[in-house]
Design a protein with these regions (language model features):
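Conserved acidic catalytic loop of the alpha/beta-hydrolase fold
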Residues: 1-10
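Gly/Ala-rich beta-loop-alpha elbow adjacent to hydrolase catalytic centers
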Residues: 14-18, 22
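Flexible "cap/lid" loop of the alpha/beta hydrolase fold
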Residues: 27-28, 33-63
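Conserved alpha/beta-hydrolase catalytic His-Asp/Glu region
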Residues: 47, 67-120
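Short beta-strand/loop motif that positions the catalytic acidic residue
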Residues: 122, 128-130
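Short alpha-helix in the alpha/beta-hydrolase fold that links the catalytic acid
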Residues: 124, 138-146
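Acidic catalytic loop of the alpha/beta-hydrolase fold
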Residues: 132-137
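Catalytic histidine-centered segment of alpha/beta-hydrolase-like enzymes
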Residues: 157-171
Length: 182
């Protein structure tokens, strides 16, 4: 990005596993970033290594089921009330084009990353968004962010389901990104 003349980004955004990527990009400080938004972002597991392997395996197998079974199986395996058939078909198509190795590495790296210790001082404003209905699911992630990054601004979204903001309410997403506080 610097080679292209960019010296600063307004924001990086990541949802779920992408939240872990957004956080690591902000912590890396390779370019100035004003805002880092983790939307239901996954924080590093605070569990024994062997337990994290089983969690990664479960997640991987769920994705492989979706990859193999297509839309019909995705409808049975996941809460899909908010998504249209076209949305689910898109997910099935994307999964079908991902290799098994790519899916495994995705879960392994996004769930088991390390935050530098001590946490570096950054000028980036951190934001953690989660929906009203997923507070229990995100309890450990929220506690982790509060302990490691006490300056984080937390926002509770309307009930959209996990990862529903961008897909289901793109206008609200655009408004929220535009209105991030400096």
């Amino acid at each position: 990005m610097k080679a292209q003349g960019y010296t600063e980004l307004y924001a990086v955004y990541g949802c779920s596993m992408g939240g872990s990527v957004a956080l690591l990009v902000a912590l890396g400080q390779l370019i100035k970033i004003k805002h880092c938004v983790m939307d239901g972002g996954i924080t590093p597991y605070q569990l024994p290594w062997i337990v994290t392997r089983f969690i990664a395996l479960k997640d991987y197998l769920m994705m492989m089921i979706g990859r193999t079974g297509g839309v019909g199986l995705l409808e049975k395996a996941f809460a899909t009330d908010e998504y249209t058939k076209e949305d689910l078909q898109y997910v099935a198509d994307v999964l079908r084009h991902c290799s098994r190795k790519t899916l495994w590495r995705t879960f392994d790296s996004c769930n088991n990353y390390k935050v530098p210790d001590p946490v570096p001082t950054i000028d980036t404003k951190l934001h953690y968004w989660y929906t009203n209905g997923e507070e229990k699911e995100r309890k450990q992630d929220i506690a982790y962010i509060k302990s490691k990054f006490p300056q984080t601004e937390f926002t509770v979204l309307p009930e959209l389901g996990h990862a529903g903001l961008v897909l289901l309410k793109p206008e609200l997403f655009e408004q929220m990104i535009s209105e991030l506080s400096d």
